[in-house]
Amino acid sequence: MVKAGCWFIDTFALCYSYRYLVTKHQQQKGLPMQNSQHALTLAQINALTEEQIDKKLRLALDNAIDRIDLTYEQMREVMLLIMTGKCNDARMGAMLTALRMKSESIDEITAAAAVMRELAERIEPANPERLVDIVGTGGDGANLFNVSTASALVAATAGVKVAKHGNRSVSGKSGSSDVLAQAGVKLDLSHDETLACLEQQNLGFLFAPNHHPAMRHAMPVRRALG
């Protein structure tokens, strides 16, 4: 079975810095820069008609099936349509599977990550430049133990402030929230409570449903794809 649909959910935190690295690579090599200046804004996406939405999603899916990489702008628009509930489950599953089968490009991954950042509910730590973000390895198919949670605990104990992103398990035996819940950790904290844990205990758990509410539109498909 093709393991599709998890890359843009379980690796988004890693992608935050990925765009920076790609930009540096393009500058060093003299390559053309991708940007979102021609992509639709969230307000424009919300104003699209059903016919316009269908046309955009159909073109993107046809390209992915033909193994043609989507541009940064095109992937951004597709991701906004997914995250605002304007892409039905059947088309979303087909899109994610087609992207996985052709192998996602740098611009596709970074565009998806950018949209997740745009729609995220954030916390504002006092010294964000001294903050470490550890995200899980869910969806990798390796069936590992919960490496990211163990790493977060070790780093926090060593004095590093860690913002640990995580969710319930999809592909493995236990996701980060499953492990922490069994240990008695309260997951449904307010943003202020999470920030207090981060500042006072060096570790704040950013439970995905609390900080990425737009992901509710993609979760049923994610679970179905495995």
Residue spans of the language-model regions?
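N-terminal cationic leader/targeting segments used for protein routing and processing
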Residues: 4, 25, 29-30, 36, ...
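Short, Lys/Arg-enriched N-terminal segments with co-localized hydrophobic residues
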Residues: 11-32
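A glycine-rich phosphate/pyrophosphate-binding beta-strand-loop-alpha-helix module
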Residues: 96, 145-199
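Phosphate/diphosphate-binding glycine-rich loops and adjacent basic-rich segments that engage nucleotide
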Residues: 193-226
